[in-house]
Structure formats: C-alpha cells, structure tokens
C-alpha cells in the first residue's frame, strides 16, 4: 500500500538548470509532481509554458512558491501584494492547490503591517487555494544574529491558518522539525523536505545527510492527518554533472517514499533511468 502523500520536486532543487529541466527530471526519476519556484526564469512565470511542460512530461504542478526571495523582489512587480496575487492566479491556472509564502521582510514595512489582513483578502479572492506560510530562520553573520522577518522567523508565533514546514530552515534555526510540526498542528499543509547540520546557515541537504529528524517527521505525517504534498527542496548547484544531480534527486525520493510508506508495506519503486546532460 503506497502512501497517499504526493512527493514532488521543487524547481529550486535543479538550480542552476532552468525550470523546464525540473519537469524532465521529475519524470525521469518518478516524482508525483512539481513545485514551481517563481523567479527570474521566464518559464517559471508563464502559465502556458508550465502547462505545456506538465502535459509533455506527464508531471502536474501541485504547488507554486510565490516570489518571496531577495532575488525575486521585482519579479512581476515591486509590490509584494501584486506578486502574491499573481502567484495565486498562476496556481489556479495550473490547478495547483497550494501557494507557499514567506513571512514579510523587516524592510517591507507596509506589507508587514497589514500582512494578516491582506492575506485574508487574497484568500477570499482565491478560496480554493491554500496559502501556506513557511518557517524561516535567524541569520548569523560575523558572530552576530539578526532576524530579517516580521514579526519573526517562526510563523506559529503570529498564527496562520496554514503552514509550510521547511526542515532545512529548522536546522538553520537550530530547532527541531518535530516540535515545529507540533506547533503548526492541523495547520501543517505542506512540507519542504531537506536537511541541515545546524551550523547556522540554510543548507538544503539531501534528507538523511544532516541531523534533522527527517525520517521521523515523514513517518509522523499520517498520524497528524496530513493531506498535503512533500516537496523536495535540496541544493544540487555544486554537483558536477546532470547524472549526479539525478542521483541526489533519486536518493531523496527513495528516502521520502520509504519513510512515508505505511508500516509493513513496501515503498513504490523509483525509476532507474538516467538521462545525461
């Protein structure tokens, strides 16, 4: 009996390869779908192009990551509300049920001041979409620590209807992902699977290569009543070939399927085909 939880591939996991390569590698390895990180790659912003890729490779888009990164502050618009609205429209066009959202940066004063109310308005305009706020982490530089998010890096302190649990961010924050999941409670709607060592930076390691309780967290999802997707969000930018990138993505998928599988059942097989690039 296979787990009902889809395991999907974030387009950030194939960087620096483009968004289109995500669909190819997801199909090659056997992921259940894709999470599109909206950023400067034009394809990531284009519903028609993404629909074409999903159809060609037979891999649906199951979540959209709104352009919340430092490098995406001018994707679509410098206005963060416009960016979030466009991300919601993109998700609807693709049939993706979830939009991942970061808490506001400290310098986004107006956005931060009205974030809860504005989010409620966006939710009202897109009632079938889940806007899942992601846990972040404090930044440590030159022996100093600061939090670039308002009201903080832990969204459960403010309280939202839906959350994305990022395990690599838990490691960077030196917190336990099981405890974070407990704080999120029934609001846990989406997972970013990765790992980290707790060195104070965001590493996005292949699950099992750090010290987060990745296996335990995945095994706990069934008892938590989780009905969302698990998106692999790892860094493969330093690998030396497409083959090695695919190997990391395959290892990660096998890890996820193994620990999501109900007790006493076998995890679904992972595709062995490797396309060299």
What are these language model-derived features?
Residues 70-74, 102-110, 135-143, 169, ...:
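Surface-exposed cleft-lining segments at the edges of enzyme active sites
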């Amino acid at each position: 009996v296979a787990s009902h939880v889809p395991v999907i591939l974030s387009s950030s996991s194939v960087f620096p390869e483009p968004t289109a390569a995500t669909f190819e590698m997801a199909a090659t390895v056997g992921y259940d779908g894709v999470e599109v990180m909206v950023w400067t790659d034009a394809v990531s912003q284009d519903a028609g192009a993404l629909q074409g890729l999903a159809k060609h490779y037979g891999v649906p888009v199951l979540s959209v990551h709104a352009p919340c990164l430092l490098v995406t502050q001018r994707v679509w618009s410098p206005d963060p509300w416009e960016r979030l609205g466009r991300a919601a429209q993109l998700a609807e066009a693709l049939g993706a049920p979830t939009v991942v959202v970061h808490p506001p940066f400290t310098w986004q004063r107006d956005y931060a001041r009205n974030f809860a109310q504005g989010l409620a308005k966006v939710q009202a305009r897109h009632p079938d979409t889940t806007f899942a706020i992601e846990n972040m982490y404090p930044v440590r530089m030159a022996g100093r620590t600061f939090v670039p998010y308002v009201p903080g890096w832990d969204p459960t302190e403010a309280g939202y209807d839906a959350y994305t649990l990022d395990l690599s961010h838990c490691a960077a924050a030196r917190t336990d992902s099981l405890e974070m999941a407990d704080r999120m409670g029934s609001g846990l709607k989406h997972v970013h699977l990765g790992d980290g060592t707790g060195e104070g930076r965001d590493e996005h390691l292949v699950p099992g290569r750090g010290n987060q309780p990745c296996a335990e967290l995945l095994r706990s999802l069934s008892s938590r009543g989780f009905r969302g997707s698990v998106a692999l969000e790892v860094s493969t930018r330093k690998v030396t070939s497409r083959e090695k990138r695919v190997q990391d993505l395959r290892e990660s998928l096998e890890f996820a399927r193994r620990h999501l599988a109900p007790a006493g059942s076998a995890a679904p097989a992972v595709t062995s085909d490797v396309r060299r690039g």
